[in-house]
Amino acid sequence: MLTTKTTRFRRAIVLTAVLGLVAAACGGDDDDSAADEPADTEAPAAEPADTTAEEPATAEEPATAEEPATAEEPATAEEPATAEESSGEPVTIDWWHIQNTEPATSNWQSVADQFMADHPNVTIDITVMENEAFKAAIQTNMQAGDVPDLFQSWGGGGLLQQVDAGLVQDISGEVGDVADDLTGVGSFSFDSATYGLPWKVGMVGFWYNKDLFEQAGLEAPADTWDGLLEQVQTLKDAGITPIAVGAGDKWPAHFWYSYLMVRLCGSDGMVEIAMDNNFERDCVIEAGQKVLDLVALDPFQEGYLGAGWDAPDGESGTMANQGAAMDLMGQWGPGAFASQLGLDNAVDLPWNLGWAPFPEVAGGAGVPTEGFGGVDGFVVGKDAPPEAVEFLKYIVSPDVQREISIDQPLPANREAADAVTDPNQLAVFEGLSQLTFLQQYLDQFFTPEVGGMVNDQTALLFGDATTPEDAAAAITATAGG
């Protein structure tokens, strides 16, 4: 059974945050996001990292930790903390983020340096981690009650659990003057209370190698599912691996399963799933079958079941080194490809990159204007000083959003949309502008437990180790539908 709070949360995520994004895109001011997800449980707490790390920041799957929060009221007796006014006394902000590749790491350091220069009493201690390391570490720290002052979040069910446990602050009163300028705030708000702010949003689509497509006599990924399957065979016949995927990390593969759900269930069906937690529907089962149909064509690179997203022999490395023709990934893909080759910008790739939306599926309730994506933001920890909220507001201010957009395009602040000039990100921006609905990544949208089960069942489907019916039943059982 869904609690009243959970129901309101899901309605807000699917409708409010999503339609806010669409309104921004259609108005000509839009934003762009990368997605990642809740956390793993059993891992050591993070060591503060230096500001240069080697692995690209990615989007990844949630963890399977405790049972989903189902209490009618927050799990602790305490009300969420609220930010107080700045005292002007020396204060330290503990900031965790996952922008661990250049130039993003240096740009974030510059943002912190600028804020500290304007606020001499503030010291910002930055911990930079790779995505999966972050998710494991934040879960460990949360369990110990040692919450960073400001940390990466994707909103959704994982944040709702943190709210219920009293681990994050209600900052509604402090951010009301900026929240209206941002797309995706609904992902960080429950029952009219706001706990964080988005700094970028975006959607998933196909990144494809135009040169390899041309070698196979193709122009771009097909706009129908059946056409895409035909292209897979055409590419194989030309001696080209059609698709790169990091099924070992699970979350990259879940993009396929989830996007097929969106196409087959449609926006109404996805909202119904959110309301009743029941995945045992014909459209979900058909989505699983279509995953199996794709797998049967053997379209992926060798070793895909054990491959990760960001390793040299993983999904992004395979694409970067022209080992596959296309990749279903978020707008952060080009940056990851460039990073694999030691480049600062994807426009310098030694091959021509293109973007295309996910295809339409014949007979499905979904339409091409319904998309799949998510938000990245920062949440304020329960013991954070007021200056942490001020720093968060600084991060999402138009000028800083424009600065960040140099390497992380599609900012959440609609006033900074004019900073989007990268041709690859403009392609995603155009895709966003066509949307009437955007479904948040399922492994973020639901609780970490449910999201983790979506990813687990996806991995089994990609390994042809389960049936569509059993996959849907397993997710439903975890969700309590």
Segments (PLM) and residue ranges:
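Conserved N-terminal structural module of periplasmic/extracytoplasmic solute-binding proteins
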Residues: G27-G28, D32-L160, V347, E387, ...
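Extracytoplasmic/periplasmic solute-binding protein
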Residues: A81, D191, Y195-L197, V204, ...
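Extracytoplasmic/periplasmic substrate-recognition and gating elements
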Residues: A117, A216, L341-D407
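A structural signal for short loop-to-beta-strand junctions that line the ligand-binding cleft
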Residues: N141, P148-D149, D177-L212, T241-A244, ...
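Hinge/lid segment of periplasmic solute-binding proteins
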Residues: W154-V204, D223, L229, W256, ...
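Short, solvent-exposed loop/beta-turn-alpha elements that line the ligand-binding surface or hinge
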Residues: Q169-L182, A247, L264-E286, L341-D348, ...
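Glycine-centered hinge/linker elements that transmit conformational signals in sensory
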Residues: V232, M275-G306, F358
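C-terminal capping/gating helix-and-loop segments adjacent to ligand/active sites or protein-protein/ligand interfaces
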Residues: D407-D418, L426-G480
